[in-house]
């Protein structure tokens, strides 16, 4: 069971370019995290976001192709599975012009109570917002 794919398109800004004249590898991770946050915000209420937060347990990222200033990219993200307080989120960053995969990544997230910062089981209410049956 996985979630629908959340998509976000953007243009590579000058601030993302490194000394090798392509996107700095750390920036891709930042874009993945931005997409995860946007997906969370798009599905949840303000009240839910005040009750719960997510923290990263680990990241895995694989760089497939470089990208450059001014290119249009699309970040795709989806939740592949979850159990207890943990959720595995996947990402692809794809160049719009030729559909080449630039980055593939996975993040293991932990669901927390926003007041105590203790891990808490992902509620049915939250999982139903994201997961396809």
Give the predicted meaning of each segment.
Residues 2-4, 68-69, 79-133:
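HotDog/MaoC-like acyl-thioester-processing domains
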Residues 9-11, 60-62, 76-78, 92, ...:
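Residue-level recognition of well-ordered beta-strand positions that form the cores
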